[in-house]
């Protein structure tokens, strides 16, 4: 895959692999943000697991898919959202209330919008999954 946004490429690849029923997918190149997003996916139960493989270059992630993702993608442009503004972005990117998750990068790291709302911090909405 080519392009200027590695996160969008990674999520597009995961979405495509899920839609055709693959059990695993390889994301290359790896980055800290992609790893953090995959960790949120794992914590929320959307993937079975992932592993970083150091190939001597940029590295790669091997993702075990569970069939639990209907759609995922990157949010462009990256929107800033306060802790009390997530409902607006839920309506825009998620199909129903309390279904799916927005992935938010905050000063405390990458987390779902549920965790950000619970801790009372805002951040930038970078991705969604449901």
Swiss-Prot record:
**Signal peptide coordinates:** none
Q: What Gene Ontology molecular-function terms does this entry list?
A: rRNA binding; structural constituent of ribosome
User: What are the annotated disulfide bridges?
Assistant: none
One GO-annotated biological process of the protein: translation
- Transmembrane segment boundaries: none
This protein's record includes keyword Metal-binding: no
Q: Which UniProt keywords apply?
A: Ribonucleoprotein, Ribosomal protein, RNA-binding, rRNA-binding
Q: Which InterPro entries does the UniProt entry name for this protein? A: Ribosomal_uS8 (IPR000630), Ribosomal_uS8_CS (IPR047863), Ribosomal_uS8_sf (IPR035987)
Q: Which domain of life is it from?
A: Archaea
Gene3D superfamilies (UniProt xref)? 3.30.1370.30, 3.30.1490.10
Q: Which GO terms describe its cellular component?
A: ribonucleoprotein complex; ribosome
Q: Which PROSITE patterns match?
A: RIBOSOMAL_S8
Matches recorded under HAMAP family: Ribosomal_uS8_A (MF_01302_A)
Subunit structure, briefly? Part of the 30S ribosomal subunit.
Function of this protein?
One of the primary rRNA binding proteins, it binds directly to 16S rRNA central domain where it helps coordinate assembly of the platform of the 30S subunit.
Which family, according to UniProt?
Belongs to the universal ribosomal protein uS8 family.
Name used for this protein in its record: Small ribosomal subunit protein uS8
Give the organism, scientific name: Haloquadratum walsbyi (strain DSM 16790 / HBSQ001)
């Amino acid at each position: 895959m080519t392009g200027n946004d590695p996160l969008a490429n990674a999520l597009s690849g995961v979405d495509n692999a899920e839609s055709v029923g693959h059990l695993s997918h390889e994301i290359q190149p790896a980055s800290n943000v992609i790893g953090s997003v995959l960790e949120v996916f794992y914590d929320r139960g959307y993937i079975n697991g992932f592993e970083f493989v150091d190939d001597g270059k940029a590295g790669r992630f091997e993702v075990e898919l569970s069939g639990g993702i209907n759609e995922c993608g990157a949010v462009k442009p990256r929107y800033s959202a306060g802790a009390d503004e997530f409902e607006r972005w839920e309506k825009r990117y998620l199909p129903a209330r309390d279904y799916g998750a927005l992935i938010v990068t905050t000063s405390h790291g990458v987390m779902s919008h549920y965790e950000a709302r619970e801790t009372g911090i805002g951040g930038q909405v970078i991705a969604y999954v449901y």
